Amino acid sequence: MNGWVARGLARRAAALGLGLRVLLCFGLCLEIAPTPIQTWSPTQAPGPSAGSCPPTNFQCRSDGRCLPLIWRCDVDQDCPDGSDEEECGTEVPNGSPSPCDIMDDCPDHNKNLLNCGPQSCPEGELCCPLDGVCIPSTWLCDGHRDCSDYSDELGCGTKTHEEGRTMSTGTPVTLENVTYLSNATVTAIEDWDSVQSGNRNVYGIIAAVAVLSISLAAGILFALSRLCAQGCLAPLGLLVSMKGSLQPEKKTSVL
C-alpha cells in the first residue's frame, strides 16, 4: 500500500515538473521571439490634373503637384522629375544672361536683380536701385539718407543756400544715373579702405623710426657715461693734487 502511494506521488511530481518546464519554455520563447517592426510607407496621393494649379503656382510634369512659383529655377529640385529646374537661366540673343530671371548670374553682386519687378513709382518720385523703395525727388541730395544704399546722397557735392533754396554744386544726379549709384558706393568704400591701409603703413614706419632713434640715443648716453666713469675722473684727481701742491708755496710766499 505504501509503495503504491509513493509511486503515485512520484508520478504526480514528474507530471507537475513537466508542466512547469513547458510553461517556463513557453514564457522564454515569447520573450526571445522578435517582435515584427511595422513600417509605414507613405503613399503619394494622386496629384491634380494638368492645368489645375493656380497662376501663382508651378505644376510638376510627372505627378501634377502644385509648387509655389518662386520654387522654380531656385537651383533646388522640388519636382520628382526635376521639371521645376528645366529651361532655367535662358540667355538673350546677344549671349548675355537675362536679367530678372531669378537666376544668380552675378554671384558677387546683385547687378542682375536691379530694377527687377514692378517699378511703379509715381511721377515726381525716384526709385532706390537696391531695394526698389520710391522716394520723392525733393529728397535727393537733402543731406539725409533715404535709400538704404545711400544712392540718394551720392554725387551731390557741397551745398549752398541762397534765398531759401538749396543748390548743389556737385555733379547733378538724374533718374538715369541713379541706377548705377550703388556701384559707386561699393567703389568708394573700397577706395576708403585702401586709404586707411596706406595710413596704417605710414604710421608703422614712423613708429619704427622713433623706436630706432630712442634706442640709438640710449646707446650713446650709455657709452658716454662709461667713458666719463673711466677717463673723466683722472683729470679731476690731477687738479686736486696740483691744488694741494700749490697751497704751501702760496703760504711761504706770504710769510
From Swiss-Prot:
Residues on the membrane's Cytoplasmic side span: 225-255
Q: Where are the transmembrane segments?
A: 204-224
Keyword list (alphabetical) reads: Cell membrane, Disulfide bond, Glycoprotein, Growth factor, Membrane, Metal-binding, Repeat, Signal, Transmembrane, Transmembrane helix
Residues of this chain annotated as glycosylated in UniProt: N177, N183
Q: Which residues lie on this side of the membrane: Extracellular?
A: 30-203
Residues binding Ca(2+) 2 are W139, D142, H144, D146, D152, E153
Q: Which branch of life, at top level? A: Eukaryota
- According to the UniProt record, which cysteines are disulfide-bonded? C53-C66, C60-C79, C73-C88, C121-C134, C128-C147, C141-C156
For whether the record's keyword set contains Glycoprotein, the answer is yes
Task: List, in alphabetical order, the GO biological process terms annotated in this UniProt record.
Answer: B cell costimulation; cobalamin transport; positive regulation of B cell proliferation; vesicle-mediated transport
Which intervals hold domain LDL-receptor class A?
52-89, 120-157
According to the UniProt record, one GO cellular component term is: plasma membrane
Please tell me whether the keyword Transmembrane helix is annotated for this protein: yes
What membrane topology term does the record carry? Single-pass type I membrane protein
Where does the record locate the signal sequence feature? 1-29
Gene Ontology MF terms? calcium ion binding; growth factor activity
* Record localization: Cell membrane
Q: Which residues bind Ca(2+) 1?
A: W71, D74, D76, D78, D84, E85
Function statement? Receptor for transcobalamin saturated with cobalamin (TCbl). Plays an important role in cobalamin uptake. Plasma membrane protein that is expressed on follicular dendritic cells (FDC) and mediates interaction with germinal center B cells. Functions as a costimulator to promote B cell responses to antigenic stimuli; promotes B cell differentiation and proliferation. Germinal center-B (GC-B) cells differentiate into memory B-cells and plasma cells (PC) through interaction with T-cells and follicular dendritic cells (FDC). CD320 augments the proliferation of PC precursors generated by IL-10.
Complex formation: Interacts (via LDL-receptor class A domains) with TCN2.
Q: What is the name listed in the Swiss-Prot or TrEMBL entry for this protein?
A: CD320 antigen
What species is this protein from?
A: Bos taurus (Bovine)
Gene label:
CD320
